[in-house]
Amino acid sequence: MPLFDLISPKAFVKLVASEKVHRIVPVDATWYLPSWKLDNKVDFLTKPRIPNSIFFDIDAISDKKSPYPHMFPTKKVFDDAMSNLGVQKDDILVVYDRVGNFSSPRCAWTLGVMGHPKVYLLNNFNQYREFKYPLDSSKVAAFSPYPKSHYESSESFQDKEIVDYEEMFQLVKSGELAKKFNAFDARSLGRFEGTEPEPRSDIPSGHIPGTQPLPYGSLLDPETKTYPEAGEAIHATLEKALKDFHCTLDPSKPTICSCGTGVSGVIIKTALELAGVPNVRLYDGSWTEWVLKSGPEWIAENRD
């Protein structure tokens, strides 16, 4: 299971009304692809948001020393950011984004990996607005309505959750990735096969040898962008996606998910875990790091 729980808009509203012990903090984790020409920070400050939300910037809350975008943050970066946002360890965090379930799974996963005790993923903000639940339409000047706190994460599950480049390269070079792992790529089929361009012009399309295409949209409702919440529904959705993209999944093998820069990979990681697939990790650097580090001889096109 994921390190966080799904919560429907209806259940979230009920939780806000009934919770008397812990503070409930909505977390806007909106992030847009650069090609969309949108500004997530401006949207948070000026557009309707769930009341009392904070803004979690996945670009800023990342490894500052890495040349790759929004790599997993160090403990200091994470703790400083949470402190500046006024988050307390006993807060119940409910994460959402304005696209649907796009960048919010990455944020919820990050919070879970860093050991925050209670994290929910709202399934999702589109539905929350559709049901006309409370929104704050006022313009704000800060990314948090709360005073600064002293947040200190006490544990991390990085070893169980993250694959780094060195491990990934050795698995590919030895041939073990294809033989001993399920490895899925969340990008579009065209990007995977090398027939569509990447969002960054300096990055060629293609895929890591030994991976299979599992586009993230195939695991979400095509209209609402929600995860199926019933167990049978998520299994049926996963089975259909695997069949549509001619993928194989052996639950006895460990699984690695990747994407372009480590965002949408968490979408499929979450779906797999909701379906009961154990031992699922994320290759954090994903395709961007792979291309820039490994060289052209390790770029595959079409199907392996």
Swiss-Prot record:
Signal peptide: none annotated. The lineage of its organism: Eukaryota, Fungi, Dikarya, Ascomycota, Saccharomycotina. Its EC number is 2.8.1.1. Keywords: Cytoplasm, Mitochondrion, Phosphoprotein, Repeat, Transferase. It is found in: Mitochondrion; Cytoplasm. Sulfur transferase that accepts persulfite from NFS1 and transfers it to UBA4 in the pathway for 2-thiolation of the wobble uridine base of tRNAs. Stimulates sulfur transfer by NFS1. Involved in metabolism of sterol esters in a tRNA thiolation pathway-independent manner. GO terms for biological process: tRNA wobble position uridine thiolation; tRNA wobble uridine modification. It comes from Saccharomyces cerevisiae (strain ATCC 204508 / S288c). This is Thiosulfate sulfurtransferase TUM1.
